[in-house]
Amino acid sequence: MAMTTDVKDELSRLVVKSVSARRAEVTSLLRFAGGLHIVGGRVVVEAELDLGSIARRLRKEIFELYGYTAVVHVLSASGIRKSTRYVLRVANDGEALARQTGLLDMRGRPVRGLPAQVVGGSIDDAEAAWRGAFLAHGSLTEPGRSSALEVSCPGPEAALALVGAARRLGVGAKAREVRGADRVVVRDGEAIGALLTRMGAQDTRLVWEERRLRREVRATANRLANFDDANLRRSARAAVAAAARVERALEILGDTVPEHLASAGKLRVEHRQASLEELGRLADPPMTKDAVAGRIRRLLSMADRKAKVDGIPDTESVVTPDLLEDA
């Protein structure tokens, strides 16, 4: 929730000069945070918000743009309500505000998505629609495998309108129904960053991007470490297997083993963890790694042929799972 609060706090302090964008934000905020109620035969506009700064911003914008007074009620945390909530209500002029914001159409019927003037407005209006929706019911998770920027929507029509607004901003968003609730989700890291900037939360975007980069670096380092560990284990097992086979080859051949092959084999047995290049330097006289590899290969081949003729276990027989497990 920390990053969600950071985004909402930054957006609630954003100064927007375009009147059209300010109206689009108010409309979106009211659409996603509340609804229309009939109280005593009158239309009441209501919005429930999770930050006092958002409630104050909305109340101020309603008064400056439309001239109507909104009342904010504070619902303290208690019982099943885990945090303080702020309920903004416009009662006396509710119907007039609903018509002017496009929440009611010309015939007085509720608009199920976002009004046409917002959906077909400017790019600034599309940004404002997202800003209002996020302030109302948005969330941003920490960067990671399941990171997401998400908005809970009052219905599928509102979700599709938000997806369309994101598309106009060059951001890929998807509408989904999760446990009966409509949501719009952005999961791509680059898209999340771009949308944060579009909405006006540039400072939070920088923090989010820094955490994302740090996590990616850490994940890459872990992958490389795991890769190195796996390579070391494979190398160790190969060395143990090679030394065991050479020992068996020397046993099979006994005194019949050629001296130059025996010396290469003994180097392999005595220096089990050494590379072929290192074995070549230890030889007397020194040899290339290809020469060492060739002699060991001929030693094993000669021993395996003799074992087959004699009907005894060859050099491969000593390479058991237990031997490799202990490597």
From Swiss-Prot:
GO cellular component: peptidoglycan-based cell wall; plasma membrane
Top-level taxon: Bacteria
DNA-binding interval(s): 275-308
A biological process term (GO) from this entry: cell division
Statement: the UniProt record of this protein carries the keyword Cell cycle: yes
GO molecular function: DNA binding
Protein keywords: Cell cycle, Cell division, DNA-binding
A Pfam family per the record: HTH_WhiA
TM stretches of this protein: none
InterPro entries noted in UniProt: Homing_endonucl, Sporu_reg_WhiA_N_dom, Sporulation_regulator_WhiA, Sporulation_regulator_WhiA_C, WhiA_LAGLIDADG_dom
Family, as annotated: Belongs to the WhiA family.
HAMAP family: HTH_type_WhiA (MF_01420)
Protein's job: Involved in cell division and chromosome segregation.
NCBIfam families in alphabetical order: DNA_bind_WhiA
Protein name: Probable cell division protein WhiA
